[in-house]
């Protein structure tokens, strides 16, 4: 998993550790960081029930067509083909996480979910932690941004799970502009947890969701997506938060019907890839530039290496900081 950057070899599993020293003190809000959309969706289980957030039309479709319907759903819901470990080794550092309970589950277990249920949350978090233990200078952003069927007890369970798994690796919520690699390394922090629920206000290591805004274009048109991304960056607040550019196309119902057997990757993502990659290559990180960039099927089109290499503009003294 390596690529060249000038005379330097970028080892993507340790790309943060190998950034030039001149970048170590730059706030992470100003760096370019690759992330994945619906990060857990590689694990989506066709044998699972339909998620509680799905509309009645989808529930009815599955009740009539059963396993066939779920196989077709997975083609459109699974936005990643790599496990957490695979994504981390390839350089992904931001994870988009959606959590759900299962109806009538006596164990009150927590699952990743997007339409269908995915892996158990504790298993996914343990997998990420194992990587961090082996790569002690790498830092991850865990963004818990959707919760389905969760009561106060479930949030308490998730908070305790985070404590048990990550412990002192978690960076408490502070002013975002203070967080640099140097700061995190000095304190042995490797995990920033963003939590889009009022629960975040009660727990020191949970960063409020508003500190990780992720404007959503909600379009199937690559040109409209790029216009939206550019406008969002232009309007980005100069200080106070991280920022996500979702380089992601969202299928409409009519799109799904037309390409029902092909799936998201073939019908939309691969066709739009050249335009989206060209947009990324023209960007610069910095206060008024891109920060975290997310995509579907992150292994496509040199997405990860392209985002990481944008950071080397700081070394050339050209960044907007």
UniProtKB/Swiss-Prot annotation:
GO MF term list: phosphoric diester hydrolase activity
PANTHER family: PI-PLC X DOMAIN-CONTAINING PROTEIN 3 (PTHR13593:SF33), PTHR13593
A Gene Ontology cellular-component term: synapse
Compartment list: Cytoplasm
Residues in the signal sequence: none
Alphabetized InterPro entries for the sequence: PI-PLC_domain, PLC-like_Pdiesterase_TIM-brl, PLCXD1/2/3, PLipase_C_PInositol-sp_X_dom
PI-PLC X-box domain sequence ranges: 22-197
GO BP annotations listed: lipid catabolic process; signal transduction
Residues annotated as the enzyme's active site: 37, 114
Pfam families: PI-PLC-X
Encoding gene per record: Plcxd3
CDD domains per record: PI-PLCXD1c
Tissues with expression: Widely expressed, with highest levels in brain, followed by heart atrium. Not detected in small intestine, nor stomach.
Alphabetic keyword roster: Cytoplasm, Hydrolase, Lipid degradation, Lipid metabolism, Transducer
Source organism per UniProt: Mus musculus
Domain of life: Eukaryota
Protein name as catalogued: PI-PLC X domain-containing protein 3
UniProt keyword Lipid metabolism, yes or no: yes
């Amino acid at each position: 998993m390596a690529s060249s950057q000038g005379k330097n070899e970028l080892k993507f599993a340790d790309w943060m550790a190998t950034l030039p020293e001149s970048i170590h003190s730059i706030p992470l809000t100003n760096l370019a960081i690759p992330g994945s959309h619906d990060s857990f969706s590689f694990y989506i289980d066709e044998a699972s029930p339909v998620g509680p957030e799905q509309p009645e039309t989808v529930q009815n479709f599955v009740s009539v067509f059963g396993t066939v319907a779920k196989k077709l759903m997975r083609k459109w819901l699974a936005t990643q083909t790599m496990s957490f470990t695979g994504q981390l080794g390839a350089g992904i550092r931001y994870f988009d996480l959606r959590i759900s309970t299962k109806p009538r589950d006596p164990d009150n277990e927590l699952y990743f979910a997007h339409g269908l249920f995915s892996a158990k949350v504790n298993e996914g978090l343990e997998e990420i932690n194992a990587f961090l233990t082996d790569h002690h200078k790498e830092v991850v952003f865990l963004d818990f941004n959707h919760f389905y069927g969760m009561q106060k007890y479930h949030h308490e369970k998730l908070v305790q799970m985070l404590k048990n798994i990550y412990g002192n690796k978690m960076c408490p919520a502070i002013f975002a502009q203070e967080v640099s690699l140097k700061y995190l390394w000095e304190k042995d922090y490797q995990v920033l947890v963003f939590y889009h629920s009022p629960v975040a206000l009660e727990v020191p290591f949970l960063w409020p969701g508003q500190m990780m805004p992720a404007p959503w274009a909600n379009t199937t048109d690559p040109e409209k997506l790029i216009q939206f991304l550019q406008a969002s960056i232009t309007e980005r607040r100069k200080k106070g938060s991280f920022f996500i550019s979702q380089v992601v196309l969202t299928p409409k119902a009519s799109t799904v019907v037309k390409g029902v057997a092909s799936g998201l990757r073939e019908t939309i993502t691969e066709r739009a890839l050249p335009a989206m990659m060209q947009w990324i290559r023209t960007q610069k990180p910095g206060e008024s530039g891109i920060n975290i960039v997310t995509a579907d099927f992150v292994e496509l089109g040199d997405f990860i290496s392209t985002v990481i290499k944008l950071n080397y503009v700081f070394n050339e003294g050209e960044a907007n900081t």
